[in-house]
Amino acid sequence: MIAYDLSEPAVVSRLEQLGPRLKILIDDSGDHGHADSGETQATQRLRISAGPANVKRQHMGQLQHNKTIVVEGPKVKMAVCGSTNYTWRGFFVQANNAVVLRGKNAIKPFVVGFDQYWSTETPAKFANTASAAWTSLGLDGINAMVAFSPHSEANPVLKFIADDIGTKTTSSLFYSLAFLYQTPGVMLDAIKKVSDDNKVFVYGISDRKVGGLDLQKPDGNVSPVFPSALGKKLPEPFKSEPVGGSGNRMHHKFLVVDFNKPTARVYLGSYNFSDTADTKNGENLLLIRNRRIAVSYMIEALRLVDHYHFRVSQQEAKSTRTRLQLAIPPRLPGKAAWWSKYYTNPLKIRDRE
């Protein structure tokens, strides 16, 4: 197991029950390394239950940011990865995702990757291992690969993804990426580039570093959604939702490209699509070329983005002193209907489709 955040008591208690069958890497960067942190307390407990030799702390070049569990037994062979940290916030507050992979072939890259992390302390050494390259998960009927960070600057995965988005997106791009607008670089440039193409429908959301969210509308404009607007006029229990801090609402890290095409694909994992995630942190990143799976992530992106798009519309209506209400059909002959732009404007056509 590899844990970035590890402070949920129910998780730690279950790990204790495994005894010496557990082998775990726990991040010790920043606050995680403090004597009173949840991660340090978990380390102390697990060293007693699993044995000191089975519990290790590390942070690679900056963070050991993986969130992976591998079960390798006579009956169960399973790996869990994604964006979900082992905390109360990760499970019950944030928008997160996790992927469960089953089978001997599927878990093998995770077993090898764990061993490489365990024996390697520096980004430069890990970047030269096979785990830093794309590796097939060997799933029947599904083209899926995984790569672990850190990568070398000579072989960055981030540029591979940016090139894919910037030059090969033909229909649509949906994204839900924590901190996108706080991590400028080739990924943000690629998203901006494809957003300028009126033949491509782009819809996305990103958590803001200082509270709230950034929402990208299909017209390419990015609108901030602030915490005050998110909580205003909400009923309980939503009104008392925890606020403050970064990544508090939206913690996903995924991109969906051309979900409605045979070439549909989705990138997902713990990987934040930044230079730091690419060349410094310990991360997992999956590339799945499967339309059904891509559609499932597109629906999650649409669920989030459409909800907050309505909040943006509320803010815009207030600032322009216009009434936000349902439109009615035209009453006079020759007057354009409210829906006519969805058949004439290229972006609106994509939206309708």
Identify the meaning behind each predicted range.
Residues V93-N97, L101-I161:
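Aromatic-Pro/Gly-enriched surface loop or interdomain linker
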Residues A132-G204, V210-G211:
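Beta-propeller domains
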Residues A3, L177-A178, F254, S270:
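Glycine-rich anion-binding loop/nest that anchors nucleotide
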